[in-house]
Amino acid sequence: MYCIELTIKLSPMPLVVQRKEHGEAKRLYSDVVGSIENGNPRLLELTCEKVEDKRITVLVSEITAVQIYEKTSSSTSKRPGFSLQN
């Protein structure tokens, strides 16, 4: 399972949708990045393949970051994302 995580301005909680296939996740990631670059469309509606009927609509101008990562079954203390530690 692959997660696409959106960070929204002034929101401490990221928005996450999931895709089963890596190719689909990469395509969605590229679509989100393209929308941020162009500002078009104004609203972006995302669906999740893991949770049926989960829909998220986001104002593209409020997205500050997007990341893609593979969700693993093992639990670790380190959260996916960027680390500022050495």
Swiss-Prot record:
It comes from the Bacteria. Belongs to the UPF0367 family. This is UPF0367 protein PMN2A_1492.
